[in-house]
Each structure stands twice: as structure tokens, then as C-alpha cells.
Amino acid sequence: MNQLNTEKKYDVIIVGAGPAGLSFACSLIDLNLKVLVVDKSNEESISNPKPDGRETALTHNSLKILQKLGVWDLIDPTSVSPLKEAKVFDGDSDSLLNFAAKKSSIGALGYLVPNNLIRQAL
């Protein structure tokens, strides 16, 4: 009995349809590559993600990547919050690193954006 060859060939397979995986996939669009994104979620929940309370802290470089991909303008600016201060703790240690935008020449260390809005824009 002949079996149909249903094997498909891809140049790049990306595991995970979160902001990083989808950004990477978008960055490959103009390179004429066959790209497959694999995720445990179904296509509907990836293309229309529901709010789940998670937020992503974007650095200035991450913001530049989203701008270059043409997706930053698709995110509602009223949902974006500037990250003015960050504190880093080390387990049970009393050590603490504190970063504050007010002590630097930049207005914000980065930006907090609802995860679903980033995924939706991508």
C-alpha cells in the first residue's frame, strides 16, 4: 500500500507562541523561509489572546524591535505603563539592587504591557 508523504519541510521551527517566539517568527517573514510556530495553544487563542493578568516588561531595545517589526503602533498606548523603578532581590539575602528612572536621563526604565496585547499585535 502506498502511503502519501505528508512530511513537510521547514527552514525554521519555533517552539512557543509567546511574545519572543512570535517576534522571532515576524522577523523572518521577509527572508523567504518556511517557518512553523508550534505551541500547545490552538490557533484561535494565539491569534485572539484573552487578557490573563500577565504583563511583559519591555526594555528600550525590546521596544525598538517591536517598532522595527511594525507592531508597536498596534498596541493601545493607554494600556502601556512606564516602568519607573525596579528592585532586584537575591533570595534570603539582604542584598538589594534598586534602579530608578528618575536618577537617569531617561523617562522610564522600560514599559509594562499586557502580554495578550503584545501577542495580539504580533
Residue ranges: model-predicted function:
Residues K50-G91:
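N-terminal FAD cofactor-binding segment of flavoenzymes
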Residues K9, S81-L122:
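Conserved N-terminal helical subregion
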Residues I13, C26-R54:
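Glycine-rich FAD pyrophosphate-binding loop
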